[in-house]
Amino acid sequence: MDIAKWVEHARTCYSTQLDTKIKVIGVIGKDYPDHGKGDNINCYLRENVFPVAATEDETCTIRGHFSEDDQILFLVMNGVDDVANIRKCLKSNPKSNYFDAMAESECQQIRMLHFLFISCHFIIIFEQTSRIDLELMRFLKKVNSARIQLRKKINQRLVASDLRDVSFNNRILSSAESEGRMVVPRLLIAFQRNNIRPDVNPGKKLQRELYEKLEKNLDNQFSDILKLYDLIDCGASSLCQLNETIPVVHLLNPKIVKRDIIGEMFEILMADAENTKISGNAGTLPSNNSFVKFLEDNFRSEKNEISLENVIELMNCLQCVLDGDLEEKHEKTAIQTFIKRIQNDHMEEARRLYTNAQRPGERRGADRFKDSEKPVKIRSKEEHLMRFNEATHYIDSVVGVNSREALSQLQAQCNEMWQSDMRACESVSMMGRSCVRKIHPTFGDQTAPEHRWTAHDASNTMISTCVCGRKQLIRPEPFSVKEANSDFYDHPDFKCCRRLWRYQFQLYQEDSEEKDDIMWADRESNSLRAAKKMAQREDELAEEDTDLDIPESLLDPDSTSPSDEDDVRVRTMSSSESSSQESDAYLRPTSRRDESMASKTERELTIDHVKRMQKLELAGKSEDFLITVPNSMTTGKLPIFPSWHLTSLGDSSIYSHGAGLKNQPNFKIGGDYLSPVVVLLDVNFDVWNRDLNKIRSEDFSRKCGKDNKDDSARVKLFVGFEYECSRGHRFFVDYNGEPLIYSKGSNVIRESAHRSSLGNVLQADLPIRRPCTCRKLPLQSAQLQKVHVVTPKAPVHITIDPKVLIPTHEGVYGTGQEPLELHHSKYYILHLPTVYSGPSGAWMPGEFNPEKQGVWMGGALKVAYKPVMSFKW
């Protein structure tokens, strides 16, 4: 009978069993002329309880039957898709058409399903086909939405009826999961038909194996579909659940369940005519043993916890769900739903404008594009505001009512999207480009753990040469002065530079640091005594190897000749790597600090520097040192890292003016020659000859010199002002700042002497940046990066004191120290800063400027006579 009538008469009919613990089972499915969903329950009960098909008076109702033997209350729902309901809708009132009648039936079905899913232990779905009905899954999703919407009101009814604390089953639910319902039902599904061939012998074991395999596959498919529609595994938002250990899918055996409907009708008719009882299977139905076992296995998995009396009270309390008393009026709900849908559409379009996403209809065509062609979601603050203004303009144009509320909601959503997943870092590199990463914790960020610290990335690289010029590497754009001027030149791949003497510039040191170790290297490097010790070291090594020049294997013209093309060719092998027999004559002294730094990675060194800076800041010493390039405006302070580098490649015999530079990559053919410079000295010739003979005798004893019969008071140096662009192209310039390239086949010695006579490159003011010799677009600017000096074998005192002027910057950039002393008969390279940063900020020139920028002030290199006897060697 109908559930309302069953509730009304249940207390009277089952008065003796009101305390019996029972289960509540819901049954849903479709009725067909030859088979109804209630037939399978009849087979389980072995009696005709539910009709084969519902009548038109029983459409969209729930039929109830309590089995005293099984202690189960069965609730069978007659739904929208039953044949009787479709027939009824076709015969509907002329004032309402078929579609209106079906819409009303669907609303009632949502209420009935809602009723079942909050009051049944198990719900059995009978599928008359061999496939899962996705339309039913979509319908259940609507039911779940209705349940979530009304759960607070239903919970109030349950509390008012004192049913909230009643134990419904042995499953424990959280307060959120139990709100608005007594139980989360377990779902079972049975298929009336299957795809197994009918000619398979049912008596064979193969048939059962086929059934089990198909059931297992359907079980997995059923679980995936429920998850796809968010019906299970969603916490408090789940509509139902599945048993994890017992199968929930069963294939009915059609040969056993199939009924002869015409035969039954004939027997009933004959029984009425003869006024006799129905014989045979009319009163007792055959049982599908496997289906009965399937149900019993699932039913036994839960204990009966709720009494029949409480179930009757629950059904009576939940009549409000079936009647629709908790729902708002249909007209009001429809209008609100329409308005809300329009608002959601407008907000979705506004979000699409902000994110620059494609409309749903355009996604199919967009799928053929690669991921690299999709719009970049990371945005700077400027881009964020621009996109937000577009979305705001759209909302203003389409929303008339409550536009302020919509704009406030849009602003909150856009800000949340930008802050959470779309905000760009926006840190600017020393070359003027922004970091392309999402906002991230940088080195020293106290709000994030150390392992999350990430370096910036401008998504742009350039090619730079090491201090000695023998190797080039690709480097990312630096984001700090230290990274640009110091860290890169300590790269572990620059092994060629580690083996050379390098001047130790005075750096800021705390009292607790290894000041003695650092200052020892400082004193030893900046004195002629250090040069003498280096010469003595060469003498010791010369006894084993008299040849102090670079090995011939490194002078192979095929490996050192630069290309005439503009394409960048980066050397991956330096001279120190190409031969294991290289002389150790120019090994630089190592300190304890050098050894400790060599064992650490680049990241560890960066973290150590950051922690040191934080320590100095906490100690209030952040103003005691420089984190920029020394400047005349910042006298009295020492830098915390070097921006200038001075190194000695070794003896002056390394350079041969007739052959040019060796092992220096990326020079153009004819562009790897230094400029000879003759310096006249005002000196007493007798003293000059005496000191010159002294130098000669020492050189002869060390087998490093040649006879020099020229006793005139003049000396010759070889100097080169080297420029380098971001592509790694290198070239020298003359006194006018123009590229110095000798044509093929020319006499370099004669032509260079002629060019030197035209102007003194030592006294010339040269540009810091000028156009590169590149012909490949886009054109590049090159920067003065190195000064090469080959000192003569003569009793002279040579110093270099660089001074640089930068446009719009105050003061003069320099080393911040006394002029640097250079020993005679050596090859030196002074490496200039890559980035000039001072009190006026950092200099960030563009990629290309046809004009010359900045000034290297002439007169930085000075040569003076100093008698040898005045030195204490």
From Swiss-Prot:
Gene Ontology process terms (BP): nuclear-transcribed mRNA catabolic process, nonsense-mediated decay
SS bond partners: none
Residues in coiled coil: none
GO cellular component terms, A-Z: cytoplasm; striated muscle dense body
Acidic residues: compositionally biased ranges: 540-550
This protein's UniProt keywords: Nonsense-mediated mRNA decay
Observed effect of gene inactivation: Defects in nonsense-mediated mRNA decay (NMD).
Primary role: Involved in nonsense-mediated decay (NMD) of mRNAs containing premature stop codons. Probable component of kinase complex containing smg-1 and recruited to stalled ribosomes.
Family designation: Belongs to the SMG8 family.
UniProt name for this protein: Nonsense-mediated mRNA decay factor SMG8
Provenance organism: Caenorhabditis elegans
Gene coding for it: smg-8
